[in-house]
Amino acid sequence: MISYEQYLAKSAVQKGVIDVFLSEDHASCAQFDPELGYTVGNALIPDGMDGSLSIMTSQANGARSSMMYNEMPCRINTYGNSFTQCSQTSDGETWQEYLAAHLGEPIHNFGVGGFGVYQAYRRLLRTEQTEDGAEYLILYIWGDDHFRSVMRCRHAVIYP
């Protein structure tokens, strides 16, 4: 049986990973945020179809980069977890981009993989008080998102 000390040593996040996470100079799929914990970063992630890389970038306002109708004002903002963020897809392939093409107007994607309901809600409140606020909001909640609001360290659960 594994001891408590061995478990902690095995499940603790390594210093190098934390250094990249806290650095604004390193590309990372997640960037530190003092209020939310983290937000979407800029990275090439090897999680696409057949081992391909997904290109994930974020705009200055923290939204995932979009291609459709960027010059137009936005009436719809989306918030939530990895489904909202569209993990495992590249910029321009998100469901928000497909819906934007159908509606003929931009849709901002403020989703972040791993977010709990409260994190997504806090991000919604923060963003909607800025010039990036929208007339219509989509707050996506699914499955275990509510548990994520009470778990202190998901890393220890994922990497036991």
Where on the chain are the PLM-derived regions?
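Extracellular glycan-modifying ectodomains
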Residues: M1-P160
